[in-house]
From Swiss-Prot:
The gene is nagK. Pathway: Cell wall biogenesis; peptidoglycan recycling. Keywords: ATP-binding, Carbohydrate metabolism, Kinase, Metal-binding, Nucleotide-binding, Transferase, Zinc. It catalyses: N-acetyl-D-glucosamine + ATP = N-acetyl-D-glucosamine 6-phosphate + ADP + H(+). Zn(2+) binds at H157, C177, C179, C184. This is N-acetyl-D-glucosamine kinase. It comes from Pectobacterium carotovorum subsp. carotovorum (strain PC1). Gene3D superfamilies: 3.30.420.40.
Amino acid sequence: MYYGFDMGGTKIELGVFDAELNKVWQKRVLTPRTHYDELLTTLVDLVHEADAQVGVQGKVGIGIPGIQTGDNDALFTANLPAAMGKPLRTDLSQRLQRDVRINNDANCFVLSEAWDAEFRSYPVVLGLILGTGLGGGLVINGRPVDGRNGIAGEFGHLRLPSDALDIIGVDIPRVKCGCGQSGCIENYISGRGFEWLYEHMYGEALPAVTIIRHYRGGEEKAREFVDRFMDLLAACLGNLLTLFDPHLLVLGGGLSNFDEIYQILPTRLPSRLLPIAKLPRIEKARHGDAGGVRGAALLHLMDN
């Protein structure tokens, strides 16, 4: 059996999967935010409860909103303050007396999609989460690419390309990012960026769902804005498609539910690519909120 944990700032979700990726048991608990020992105990108790439910000792994979850094496995994860700077993998492996694997939750999302029955044949899968920020990951031949520092999928912290300024104006504010830099693309093409850009251009703060409703209703400002946003999205994604040349691009997060993306984006991307480049298949994520635990379980299952 394969155990996948999706650890968030407010909840920890555990999904138990068999070798065919069928979910056989699940449980959700609140995330201890202050005390590391309490967090460890919560995870250990969940694993032992799952063992009792399925009658075997499962293999443990964990997706976290952050990265594992350095040689001692210390975590860099602002959303899990109890685990910040702690060697969670080492400590949990010691307590459980079994191998524990940890990866970024966005990598787990992409891994889950890459192992979907419909998508499994694609050698290179690029995934983007257009949510509050812009997360993502790259899976090649069924395995996530982590990089030297574990930040290979932090696409949101690439800077705005020069042709983006032709679309949204050279005087666009270089928004200060949480990473400490300015002009990171997640502040412009994420769900939050979608709303910020609209307010910047039209002086009116509206939620994304309202802007999209106005767009579908034919409202002129919303139509103009979405047209420019799609050009901006294509300009930013064009660099990623040229860099990684994926067979499949999977989109997740709240903005991925704007279904018009899948009709408009393929018409805007070709001019951003090399003339010989063929577009990848572009799809909405198949597994939604369940992708986190599924991908975490795959951190072990992918070796089979």
